[in-house]
Amino acid sequence: DALVLAYSQAVLVAAAGNDGRPNEPLCRGAPMYPANHAWVLGVMARTEFPNAKGDYLAGFSNWDCKTSNGNEYELMAPGAAVWSTLPGDSYSAWSGTSMAAPVVAGIAALARTRWPDKTTYSSRFIMGQVGATGGNLKAITPLKGPAVSYPQADAYNALTSTPSPELSFEELWLFDEVAQGDGNDGDGRVDSGETVELAIVIRNRWGKADNVVATLSTP
């Protein structure tokens, strides 16, 4: 509840963690909170240069198992061998998602300075400017199949890109209860002769979208 209240007034940023694991039980992982909340920008760590396989995801970084499903780490930021200050007037290069998250927090602060009106430009708008404008970089995870890609932080693009809708399908519920039609059997499947109702969740990751039209098709 505290985070939800804070989200209404501020952009929330959190480190994804350094266990090298995915964020969902679906992938035999476990989420890191608060980074995995939908109203928090969860930050993974990337390397400065790709390895021989073209992978930018830091090996220690937790990673997103299934993107655009509402529970996720949104983007990568530099988090490997990042120079920072230490007590005693010294410097050292440290690695971790805790080094990457401040990069994103700084970009979010710049974006809020660029768009200060919170009524017109909500926290979700700033999250979109930061998380959807940097382009994607290749990431190789332990999952079988092709490599994935994650958005990266880019301060210049976050401050200069024109917002546009970025819609994705998130979730679907199907209802075929007997009360909805004489031919319904309530088994949760679409059978011949049934009258069904669908509840579809579409997520907009970035700019404002008006008069959205969805088309349902079958193979």
Show which residues each predicted segment covers.
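C-terminal subdomain of the subtilisin-like protease fold in secreted/lumenal serine endopeptidases
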Residues: 1, 39-42, 53-56, 113-186
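Extracellular S/T/G-rich loop segment that most often corresponds to the catalytic His/Ser-adjacent loop
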Residues: 9, 32-113
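Active-site neighborhood of phospho(di)ester-bond hydrolases with catalytic His/Asp-centered motifs
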Residues: 13-17, 43-44
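Distinct, well-ordered alpha-helical segments
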Residues: 22-34
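Outer-membrane beta-barrel proteins
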Residues: 186-190, 202-204
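Short, solvent-exposed loop/turn segments enriched in Ser/Thr/Gly
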Residues: 192-199
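Short acidic, flexible loop segments centered on an aromatic residue
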Residues: 201-219
